[in-house]
Amino acid sequence: MKRTYQPKKRHRQRVHGFRKRMSTSNGRNVLARRRRKGRKVLSA
């Protein structure tokens, strides 16, 4: 059985990246929440 996680840099950025997060209001909520929590890394 093949493993489910087959990493691709482009896919990771496009789905979970900073610009993707900034492009929607909910994504901006995610970033704000992570800033409030004090995360060192905000997005992929």
From Swiss-Prot:
Recorded coiled-coil stretches: none
Keyword Ribosomal protein annotated: yes
Keywords: Ribonucleoprotein, Ribosomal protein
Annotated InterPro entries: Ribosomal_bL34 (IPR000271), Ribosomal_bL34_CS (IPR020939)
PROSITE patterns (alphabetical): RIBOSOMAL_L34
Molecular function, one GO term: structural constituent of ribosome
PANTHER family xref list: LARGE RIBOSOMAL SUBUNIT PROTEIN BL34M (PTHR14503:SF4), MITOCHONDRIAL RIBOSOMAL PROTEIN 34 FAMILY MEMBER (PTHR14503)
Alphabetized NCBIfam families for the sequence: rpmH_bact
Name of this chain's protein: Large ribosomal subunit protein bL34
Organism this protein belongs to: Ligilactobacillus salivarius (strain UCC118)
Gene from which this protein is expressed: rpmH
